[in-house]
Swiss-Prot record:
EC number: 2.3.1.180
Cell location: Cytoplasm
Record key words, sorted: Acyltransferase, Cytoplasm, Fatty acid biosynthesis, Fatty acid metabolism, Lipid biosynthesis, Lipid metabolism, Multifunctional enzyme, Transferase
Catalytic activity: malonyl-[ACP] + acetyl-CoA + H(+) = 3-oxobutanoyl-[ACP] + CO2 + CoA
Free-text comment on this protein's domains from its UniProt entry: The last Arg residue of the ACP-binding site is essential for the weak association between ACP/AcpP and FabH.
Family: Belongs to the thiolase-like superfamily. FabH family.
Gene Ontology molecular function, alphabetical: 3-oxoacyl-[acyl-carrier-protein] synthase activity; beta-ketoacyl-acyl-carrier-protein synthase III activity
Subunit: Homodimer.
Name of the protein described by the UniProt record: Beta-ketoacyl-[acyl-carrier-protein] synthase III
GO cellular component: cytoplasm
Pfam families: ACP_syn_III (PF08545), ACP_syn_III_C (PF08541)
Annotated SUPFAM superfamilies: Thiolase-like
Amino acid sequence: MTDIAEITGINKIGLLSLGAYRPERVVTNDEICERIESSDEWIYTRTGIKTRRFAADEETAQTLAIEAGRKAIANALLTGAEIDAVIVATSTHYLQTPASAPAVATALGAQGVPAFDLSAGCAGFGYAVGVAGDMIRGGSASKVLVIGSEKLSPALDMTDRGNCFIFGDGAGAVVVGETAEQGIGPTVWGSDGSQSNAIRQDIDWMDFAAAPDPEGPRPYLRIEGTSVFRWAAFEMGKVGQRAMEAAKVGPEQIDVFVPHQANTRINELLAKNLHLRADAVIANDIEHTGNTSAASVPLAMETLLSTGAAKPGDLALLIGYGAGLSYAAQVVRMPPVPFE
C-alpha cells in the first residue's frame, strides 16, 4: 500500500499583529434619538454606548476588511505575498456569492492563497482565529490573516426603539503565525440552534426580492434583547471558564478581559462571574464604537493597546457570542502595539 505523506505543522502560534479600521462618521445617541422616543441617558444606562461609527455609502464590509487587513500586515512587518491564507468573518457582505475574502486577499497582495468568508455572527472573529490556528498547527498554512468586518448600519431599522442604537460599523484584523511561546490557547466554541430566532434577519432575501410592496418587510436585523441578555450573562461565563481550563490558566492569571462588545452590563456580570482579579483590565470599546459584531473583539483589543491600558504579552481572555446563537473563546497573549 502506498503511504500518503504525513503533515506536520507549527504548534506554538500567536497573534503577530493587529490592525483596525473605523469609519469616519461618528453617530451620537442624540442623532439616533431624532428617529425614536429615547434619550442619550437611557441608551447609555442600558447599553454603555455613547457613540458608534457608520460607514460611508461607498464603503462595504469588503472595503473595511481591506483597510484593517492592510494595517495588520504592515504592523506584522510583512507583505501580502507572505500571507498564506485569508479568513474574513462577516455577516454583512452584500453578496451571497462570491465571498469577499478572495477579493480582499488579492487587494492585499496575497494572490492565489486560500481565502474564504466565515459567518458566525458576533462570534465570527473567535471562530476565525480558531480555524486559523488549526490550519497552522495542521501544516496547511504558516501565516493567516484573520479579519472581522461588518457594515451593519444598512441592516438597521432606525425606527426600532429596541435595537437601532446598538450597532456600528468597523473592521479589525490580526495575523496569526509562529511565536516563541504559546500565544493562542485551545478554542472553546459551540452553538445553540434552538435559539436561532433570538438574533435574526427579518425576512429572507428570496421573499424580499419577491415582495411586490416596496413599503413591505425589509431584511432588517432584529434582536430578542431579554433572551440574548440572559443567555450571554449566565452562559458565557461558563464558556470563559472552559477556555481558561483548556489553556491551563486560572482567573488570577488573566491580565485582560476582552468580551464581545454587546452590552456593558453583560460584560460587568461576566467579569464578576469569572472571578477575575480586581486589577484585570476589561475592554469597554462599546462606549464609542457600539456593537460591531465580528469586528468587536479585535477593535476592542486595538483600543486597549493603543491607549496603553493593555500591554503586548498580557494574558487575555477573549469571548465572542451572538447570532446562531454561537460562541467562541480563547486565551491569548496580546499582540504588539499597532503603529499603523
